[in-house]
Amino acid sequence: MKTWQYQYQLFCLAVSFFSRLPVPKSTPYSDERMNQAGRYFALVGTLLGLLCVLVYAFASLFFPYQVAIVLMMAFSLLLTGAFHEDGLTDMADGIGGGMTLDKRLTIMKDSRIGTYGSATLTMALIGKFVFLTTLARQPDFGLMIVVAYTLSRAVAATLIYDMPYVSDSDTSKSKPLANAQSSTELAILILTGVLAAISLGLGVGLLLILFAILFRWAFKRWLLARLGGFTGDCLGGAQQLMELGIYLVLIAVVQ
């Protein structure tokens, strides 16, 4: 099989895993391929960010920018099936409500939402709206969204490289992530994230890269202390928190 065709199939697998966008039904699947598709998780973020920016631009033709942002956020939730928000909620419930490792993992698998999860999700959505409305008047607002979607997924996906998977891999929907990430996957993720960051300019890009390094270090230490590793929900939580952090950094820069 030609290399480009194989890479395209891996990208399609990444798209199907992280969004509800249709991909060719003929795309072959295996746990090994899904694990290799991790190299394109950040690039999927680029695609999702571009689609969200298009929705915002179109909605802005008819509505005030605040309404356009709400519509864009709603579209993003539909686009991903609230995949990452669900992970953030489950992570908050499990780590917040469980006193032992087993209890935390059990709570994270529970489909019901608890106090910690609902409070965290509410604050995340409100925060995202406030941060985006603060940035909306910037000339490169659309690029900021694409960068946030890309870099946040790059950082979250790199956690697979050097952290143990602690969930039950036989029943988890993130089972392919239980396999170790290769240096090739890691390098592609880092390169994608770095290119996205510096697209906003070298100075801002370096600041975002520094923030990404610090966030990953702190989040990894926190997960190791609480869970001893990561779960699929933790990756979703990392993406959401990192995205919010990127918006905060950008707000600090433009103020």
Swiss-Prot record:
Compartment(s) where it occurs, according to its Swiss-Prot or TrEMBL record: Cell inner membrane
Cofactor(s) it depends on: Mg(2+)
Chief site of localization: membrane
A GO BP annotation: cobalamin biosynthetic process
Annotated EC: 2.7.8.26
Keywords: Cell inner membrane, Cell membrane, Cobalamin biosynthesis, Magnesium, Membrane, Transferase, Transmembrane, Transmembrane helix
Gene Ontology molecular functions: adenosylcobinamide-GDP ribazoletransferase activity; cobalamin 5'-phosphate synthase activity
Regions that span the bilayer: 43-63, 64-84, 113-133, 141-161, 195-215, 234-254
InterPro entries on file: CobS (IPR003805)
Bilayer disposition of the protein: Multi-pass membrane protein
Pfam families (UniProt xref): CobS (PF02654)
GO cellular component: plasma membrane
Keyword Transferase among record annotations: yes
Catalytic activity: alpha-ribazole + adenosylcob(III)inamide-GDP = adenosylcob(III)alamin + GMP + H(+); alpha-ribazole 5'-phosphate + adenosylcob(III)inamide-GDP = adenosylcob(III)alamin 5'-phosphate + GMP + H(+)
Pathway(s) served: Cofactor biosynthesis; adenosylcobalamin biosynthesis; adenosylcobalamin from cob(II)yrinate a,c-diamide: step 7/7
HAMAP family associated with the record: CobS (MF_00719)
Role summary: Joins adenosylcobinamide-GDP and alpha-ribazole to generate adenosylcobalamin (Ado-cobalamin). Also synthesizes adenosylcobalamin 5'-phosphate from adenosylcobinamide-GDP and alpha-ribazole 5'-phosphate.
Similarity-based family: Belongs to the CobS family.
Protein name, as recorded: Adenosylcobinamide-GDP ribazoletransferase
Gene: cobS
